[in-house]
């Protein structure tokens, strides 16, 4: 999963327009242009596509935390110079204010099951003996689950049915 993929999915999940995306970066005290945002959101095969580096992605995630949870007083956290799926998952957990049970439920929406122990291994320090690297499949399923939770398709409305012609005649 590339940083650009994560950025595109978060934009879709939260239904953010370009101005809102610029605002999220501004929440982390970084100014970006509409053109930069547009280039990051383009498809990988587009000639104007520009790759989002780890520091820029970390800045966006810090801004997302500030945007969704409110900015804390004092100095802002420094963006990490290199990211991995574990850090991205942790920052999304913080931004969406999710507990372990809620993360497991989001993964379950996508039909992906993990135990609490497997999940907690993703949030441990890399030196810890029970640390586990978060694979692309887990992050992809988590983002897909968030999409189902926060941005359901219109045709996913459970229990909806059109009234039959018989009902109208009565």
What residue ranges belong to the model's regions?
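Solvent-exposed, non-transmembrane amphipathic alpha-helical segments
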Residues: 27-31, 41, 45, 57, ...
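Acidic (E/D-rich), amphipathic helical modules within compact regulatory domains
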Residues: 20-70
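Leu/Val/Ala/Ile-rich N-terminal alpha-helices, chiefly Sec-type signal peptides and the beginnings
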Residues: 3-6, 11-13
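Short N-terminal segments
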Residues: 1-2, 33-35, 165
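Short, solvent-exposed interaction modules
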Residues: 62-113, 150-152, 156, 163-170
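A structural feature that tracks compact, well-ordered secondary-structure segments
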Residues: 10, 16-28, 35, 40, ...
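Short, flexible segments with low predicted structural confidence
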Residues: 8-9, 31, 60, 74-76
